[in-house]
Structures are given as structure tokens and as C-alpha cells.
């Protein structure tokens, strides 16, 4: 596991003020899935990694989720929710709903990285970015699939 130690008390102010928000990815049948900024239990929800931004703010909101074999996908089971992330392409939309505001992100970069590569957590403050991270190939933990998106509209 390449993720740094998670300490809820060291979250950015933005995260503790917004403990949960929702994400929808229509192309892969994810609708209003819960994202937590204060807990790392990937069996209960997706996780917005501590120290990264949140949707609508400049910076990079990094969202982690479990994947598995695509045939086991269940949009209501957080142990399988990212099983079809590999189907996403540049130009696809991701929506986040935070404090009643919908933010539309458009995917612009998809890469596969080694498990010890933490570059997905890096912050860039020139815009609002969203990064999805899951294991790949589906059903393994060999590599990390990283899907980057940029805020298009509010």
C-alpha cells in the first residue's frame, strides 16, 4: 500500500468542514456515491485523500476506491465500485455534488503507475482537479490506474 499514514486530525480545513460529498460517473453507472474526507474505510465509501483538495477548490482532490473484476461490479458495493474505471476515456464527465453545488469535471489524462508512485497526490493550484485512483488490472493490486479530470463548469 503506497498511501501515506492517514490521520483525520491533520486534514485540511476544507476537508473537516465537508466530511462527505457525492460523486457521479454516468459512463460507468456510478450515481451519487459517497466520498469521505475524514475516514479511510474503502469498504464503506470512496475516500478523498487527506491533504489533497476538495471539489470546487483550486488543487487536486484525490479520490481512492476499490476495484475488482468487472463482472462483480455493484454500484452500491464500495468494495467493487471502481471496477469499471478502466472504461473511462479522455473527454468523459465526472460530477461531484458538494454543499448543494454540482461541479462538472472532464477527464484529460489517464495513466497506469507503479504502486509506489505517489505522483497522483501532487497538488497543482492553477485550477480545480479531480483524480481517481484504483488498482489495475481489475481484480489485482499490481498497478494503479490514475484518471485525471479538470473542472469544466459549476
Spans of features found by a protein language model:
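Solvent-exposed, non-transmembrane regions of membrane-associated and secreted proteins
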Residues: 1-154
